[in-house]
Amino acid sequence: PLRHGAAFHRLFGRPALEMTMVGVTGTKGKTTTTHMIKAVLEAAGHKVGMVGTNGVYYPGHHYDLNNTTPESYELQKILRQLADAGCDACVMEVSSQGIMMDRVAGIHYKVGVFTNLYPDHIGPGEHSSFEEYRSWKGSCSSAAMSAW
């Protein structure tokens, strides 16, 4: 899967390198934080795209997503759309599932925000224990979010 994410990054021409990437992770507050960062960047004159729980936004466009952090092929396709639309920044929610499933492979974030960590998302469909969840969130500062 990691190789696939990096391959899709190359397939779409490395769109994340054409924008300032801001990644937001944490148990709670990702959506609110991404909206606030987007508003600040827009007020500063940037053309901003946003990817997360509420979908994809870029000037004049909005559409829904199935996942907070889309699968790697879909994510790279979205980033290409944002870059082609002239976005110079992208603010995105980065879920622990997105990290665990290598959906963000190939993306280097210039800015990383870690909101908080609570013992949520524990169960058969997500993380087997809080320790595992904490480990994946912690990986944000190493492999998945290497530019932090």
Where are these regions (language model features)?
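Phosphate-binding loop of NTP-binding sites
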Residues: 5-148
